[in-house]
């Protein structure tokens, strides 16, 4: 692909604007709270779009499109089952604890609820996960620039890292949040025309489903395997995802989704930056409204790509293969951009892709520098320093967080679908963590010793499950089977779901067991940290759309209707 001058101008203006926001906000970064939490001054709608956009990284755009090509419409489970219910739960039940406790991070809340060792364990595991997640976005960006512009992969990765480093170093979380709002609108503007052109080329939704019928039957599945969500979930072998309904509901819908959306500081940080408790509770609910529509923006392009690639006709393009002979699903979006967009629109589409990658990188790096500075450096390395010292350490953490992310980008190249890699990371870190939070917030008997033992055991259970299982067609190694292959899963996704279920179950069981034989904290120390001991926020006199419970119920109702519509 050879972008024209207008394409380069569009991308150049975007990069200049992004860095300009960082420069403009630099003079407001006077304290560590300004830098790490935006001074808790962000309006609900801005924080809501940033909450959504922080998750619109490589896993959302490249990863979901890849999963759309690989698994079909069933990928929408990551939204309608694996995101919306958890986002509603966060806003209605969990934000009062996060925001009301005045904790500066999720690990700090764990310290307040449990003890220092539980906070330290979570801080280290979370910092590691954010580095890998940021690395995935860098890998995707390097892949894109290498494919579409012909740039060397190494150069592409380091260039993208330098740009993200620039605006976070200058403007901190505030710069990241306002850039994420800009990136949200760019992503919608860039990909909506792509879906329209792709569907028009295939003869509309009916033409797409007819092509997908051929895709499904050619691989030995029922005709609707790629175009339905639930109808083929009765047995793992009857759908390309290789997962039965229980794995979707329990593994994705409960453990992985609640573990990510309710405990991952990357997204929770945006809500904690809101200007009030009421605004903080509405942030994930505001984000849930556009979130439920995103399958049509990012999954459908992948379905169009596999339909066109398998049954070439009007489209005339095919997904390339990796060196191991597998289809490179991660190139679904780039290949469609190259095929459908003329010059000018191509610049907009490329800018939308770049925006999504930079959003994902920035979200992870801002979460990393906060957790490193507050929960590792201040807690264990240098206590009692001035606020200015921690502000400077946050900037230093931004630099080495970016450097570690670059290293993680090269690890991501071992997966032919980056969504599979990310679900594996979440299974190791977020799945056991959600069990800890669930017990900590809703069971006052849970103790610090129980939480610590549960987190360690849950992560160990995830590692053991991964070491003893493998997905069909995967080589022994990073994808599993390190010790032995006792069970073979139909797909990597199924393996990841059951890894998460194992981690959650073991963590929950061990935490309860150890808590019952150790001394709990006095109830007076748990006020504001446990549901039964915390006063309920008053919602009297507010319209329904400003009341989290009513807004959450409306969001869940629409989501349920979408599940039935594409059953």
How would you name each of these model-derived features?
Residues 1-567:
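Membrane-embedded helix-loop-helix hairpins and adjacent transmembrane boundary segments
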């Amino acid at each position: 692909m050879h972008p024209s001058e207008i394409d380069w101008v569009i991308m150049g203006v975007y990069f200049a604007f992004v860095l300009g926001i960082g420069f403009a906000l630099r003079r407001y970064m006077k304290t560590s709270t300004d830098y790490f939490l935006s001074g808790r001054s962000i309006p609900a709608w801005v924080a809501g779009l940033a909450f959504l956009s922080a998750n619109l990284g490589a896993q959302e755009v490249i990863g979901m499109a890849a999963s759309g090509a690989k698994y079909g419409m069933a990928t929408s489970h990551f939204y309608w089952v694996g995101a919306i219910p958890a986002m509603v739960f966060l806003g209605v039940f969990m934000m009062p604890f996060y925001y009301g406790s005045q904790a500066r991070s999720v690990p700090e809340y764990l310290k307040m609820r449990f003890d220092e060792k539980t906070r330290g364990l979570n801080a280290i595991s979370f910092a590691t996960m954010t580095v890998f997640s940021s690395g995935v976005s860098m890998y995707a960006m390097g892949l894109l620039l290498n494919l579409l512009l012909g740039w060397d992969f190494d150069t592409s990765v380091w260039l993208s890292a330098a740009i993200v480093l620039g605006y976070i170093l200058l403007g901190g979380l505030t710069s990241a949040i306002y850039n994420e709002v800009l990136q949200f609108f760019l992503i919608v503007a860039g990909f909506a025309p792509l879906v329209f052109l792709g569907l028009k080329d295939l003869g509309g939704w009916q033409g797409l489903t007819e092509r997908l019928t051929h895709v499904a039957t050619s691989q030995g599945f029922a005709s609707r395997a790629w175009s339905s969500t639930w109808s083929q979930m009765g047995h793992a072998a009857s759908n390309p995802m290789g997962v039965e309904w229980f794995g979707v509901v329990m593994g994705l819908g409960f453990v992985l989704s609640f573990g990510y959306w309710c405990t991952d500081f990357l997204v929770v940080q945006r809500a904690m930056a809101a200007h009030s408790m009421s605004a903080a509770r509405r942030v994930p609910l505001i984000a849930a409204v556009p979130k439920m529509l995103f399958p049509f923006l990012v999954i459908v392009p992948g379905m169009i790509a596999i339909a066109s690639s398998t049954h070439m006709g009007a489209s005339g393009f095919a997904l390339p293969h990796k060196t191991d002979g597998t289809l490179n699903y991660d190139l679904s979006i780039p290949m469609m951009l190259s095929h459908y967009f003329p010059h000018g629109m191509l610049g907009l589409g490329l800018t939308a892709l770049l925006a999504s990658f930079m959003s994902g990188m920035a979200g992870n790096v801002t979460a990393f520098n906060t957790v490193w500075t507050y929960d590792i450096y201040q807690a264990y390395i240098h206590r009692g320093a001035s606020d200015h010292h921690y502000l400077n350490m946050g900037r230093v953490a931004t630099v080495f967080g970016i450097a570690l992310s670059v290293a993680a980008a090269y690890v991501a190249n071992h997966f032919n679908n980056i969504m599979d890699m990310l679900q594996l990371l979440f299974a190791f870190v977020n799945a056991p963590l959600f069990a800890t939070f669930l017990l900590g917030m809703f069971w006052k008997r849970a103790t610090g010793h129980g939480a610590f033992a549960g987190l360690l055991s849950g992560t160990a259970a995830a590692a053991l499950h991964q070491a003893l299982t493998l997905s069909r067609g995967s080589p022994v190694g990073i994808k599993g089977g390190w010790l032995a292959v006792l069970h073979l899963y139909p797909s990597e996704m199924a393996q990841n779901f059951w890894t998460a279920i194992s981690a959650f179950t073991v963590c929950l069981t061990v935490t309860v067991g150890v808590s019952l034989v150790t001394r709990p904290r006095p109830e007076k120390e748990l006020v504001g940290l446990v549901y039964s001991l915390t006063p309920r926020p008053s919602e009297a006199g507010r319209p329904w759309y400003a009341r989290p419970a009513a807004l959450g119920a409306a969001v869940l109702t629409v989501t349920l209707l979408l599940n039935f519509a594409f059953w």
